[in-house]
Amino acid sequence: MVAIKDITARQILDSRGNPTVEVDLLTDGGCFRAAVPSGASTGIYEALELRDKDQTKFMGKGVMKAVENIHKIIKPALIGKDPCDQKGIDKLMVEELDGTKNEWGWCKSKLGANAILAVSMACCRAGAAAKGMPLYKYIATLAGNPTDKMVMPVPFFNVINGGSHAGNKVAMQEFMIAPVGASTIQEAIQIGAEVYQHLKVVIKKKYGLDATNVGDEGGFAPNISGATEALDLLMEAIKVSGHEGKVKIAADVAASEFFLQDDKVYDLDFKTPNNDKSQRKTGEELRNLYKDLCQKYPFVSIEDPFDQDDFHSYAQLTNEVGEKVQIVGDDLLVTNPTRIEKAVQEKACNGLLLKVNQIGTVSESIEACQLAQKNKWGVMVSHRSGETEDSFIADLVVGLRTGQIKTGAPCRSERLCKYNQLMRIEESLGSDCQYAGAGFRHPN
């Protein structure tokens, strides 16, 4: 048996310059590293990301307490354990070493989901090496998936930013392109990159050079006023790139960010202080707006169209457009099996956004994915806006056979390292894999 010999944790910086946790896990087979991401628009039901709150350092965002928890609590308990026992190690960290719970399950508020996840991911890499497998194949075995014919995902590139990710007036957070008409991941990434480069030219011509600055996830944030303006830019870029018909559109609305709790309305002008309230919409009005957009543009997926507790509006929209358009829960579900069960019962959505740091372990991420797939949902594996050079989710999406991933624009190294890893995986698999393409919601 291979055993864990040592664990070293440290504070590093993510793509926004904020501290995050990195772990080196040592076995007889070598040293295995993992670093965790963090989000800007976070759902209130996510597992706890432990921050130091010392305002004299990194504006309170240090993670030295999480690092200390790894060294003092997690490491002594894991020395000598078999890294191939992923479930056992995750369970030990979550239920015994941490042990904190809320109504939605294990919340990791003692040790921090960032501490637990870093160790969980490093352990997964060590387990793969011990079994002599590439990480994606090892994850497939953990999930009980076949390893003979793998599925390469459709990449959803976030190329125009609004919402909390941008300084423009657009309420919706992400406008994405999805090259479903490609035949390989390599071709899909090429199409995505070409549309992105043409979009840059289109934006520069219309709004000037400074409009091509990029946001946290590599997308552009031109000074546009609303969703239709953003979508028209996308359609123009797709057209001039010569990829019409091969590229569909998706959006992450992140509606919880502009839901006014007291008035129970959505404010599409939420970034203008003391605005005239003319852009406020009820759940029903917002639903009708989405339906209009879906008729006008080639939408295949809409994420977080309503507030994270507005199960009713979700269910109505899913009922009305869900066959043609995937309705994805992110803040609604926070990769949490208990929240997924509730959404299944209420028929609230038909897609899960899978973010490993929302739930905090590899095992629970696999469980959430399997629960969604069992209920015939789509599953989109996702990065966070604060990322690192760790490409774990590229292997995860192939291992879990979800057929779809979003990890930013084809720009900025912390995004590209995931796309580049997907191309490497496809190359190593050769004819033993297929591109999910138009069937990305239910890849066979």
UniProtKB/Swiss-Prot annotation:
Cofactor remark from the record: Mg(2+) is required for catalysis and for stabilizing the dimer.
Catalytic reaction annotation: (2R)-2-phosphoglycerate = phosphoenolpyruvate + H2O
A GO molecular function held by the record: magnesium ion binding
Main localization of the protein described in the UniProt heading: cytoplasm
Pathway(s) where this gene product acts: Carbohydrate degradation; glycolysis; pyruvate from D-glyceraldehyde 3-phosphate: step 4/5
Species of the source: Toxoplasma gondii
GO CC terms, sorted: phosphopyruvate hydratase complex
One Pfam entry name: Enolase_C
Protein name: Enolase 2
Complexes and interactors: Homodimer.
Keywords: Cytoplasm, Glycolysis, Lyase, Magnesium, Metal-binding
Similarity comment: family membership: Belongs to the enolase family.
List of catalytic residues: E217, K355
Compartments in which it is found: Cytoplasm
HAMAP family from the UniProt entry: Enolase
Known cofactor(s): Mg(2+)
Further information: While ENO1 and ENO2 display similar K(m) values, the pure tachyzoite-specific enzyme (ENO2) has a threefold specific activity at V(max) compared with that of the bradyzoite-specific enolase (ENO1).
UniProt EC number: 4.2.1.11
Lineage top rank: taxon: Eukaryota
